[in-house]
Swiss-Prot record:
Pfam families: Keratin_B2 (PF01500), Keratin_B2_2 (PF13885). Belongs to the KRTAP type 2 family. Interacts with hair keratins. Keywords: Keratin, Repeat. It comes from Homo sapiens (Human). In the hair cortex, hair keratin intermediate filaments are embedded in an interfilamentous matrix, consisting of hair keratin-associated proteins (KRTAP), which are essential for the formation of a rigid and resistant hair shaft through their extensive disulfide bond cross-linking with abundant cysteine residues of hair keratins. The matrix proteins include the high-sulfur and high-glycine-tyrosine keratins. This is Keratin-associated protein 2-1. Residues 5-112 are annotated as: 10 X 5 AA repeats of C-C-[CDPQRWG]-[APRS]-[CIPSTVD].
Length: 128
């Protein structure tokens, strides 16, 4: 089947049951098919013929998505309520006990476990 991508870009590619589709209509940052929208962006294994970059810069500053909605998408976090200023590409909700978000609106700017976190306010200190 041929699916249409969000925004003004339409995809004529159909591979594995999904089209090369941005994460959302408002903010096309990631490129992944509709059948692989559960974790981090992995178009290399889901859509080999994807024509968009894996992590495009967003056209405008957008805060990190709430947990479990569009986790793993690259988002500039300049407007997130934290001290982070870099662009990260990590899941918004970690499934481990190392660093759990305080609330669903926490920014997804958490480094791997065991490293100093620049976003200590977004993680439970008792669990990190």
């Amino acid at each position: 089947m041929t699916g249409s991508c969000c925004g003004s870009t339409f995809s004529s590619l159909s591979y594995g049951g999904g089209c090369c589709q941005p994460c959302c209509c408002r903010d096309p940052c990631c490129c992944r098919p509709v059948t692989c929208q559960t974790t981090v962006c992995r178009p290399v294994t889901c859509v080999p013929r994807c024509t968009r970059p894996i992590c495009e810069p967003c056209r405008r500053p957008v805060c990190c998505d709430p947990c479990s909605l569009q986790e793993g998408c690259c988002r500039p976090i300049t407007c997130c309520p934290s001290s982070c200023t870099a662009v990260v590409c990590r899941p918004c909700c970690w499934a481990t006990t190392c660093c759990q978000p305080v609330s669903v609106q926490s920014p997804c700017c958490r480094p791997p476990c065991g490293q100093p976190t620049p976003c200590s306010t977004t993680c439970r200190t008792s669990s990190c």
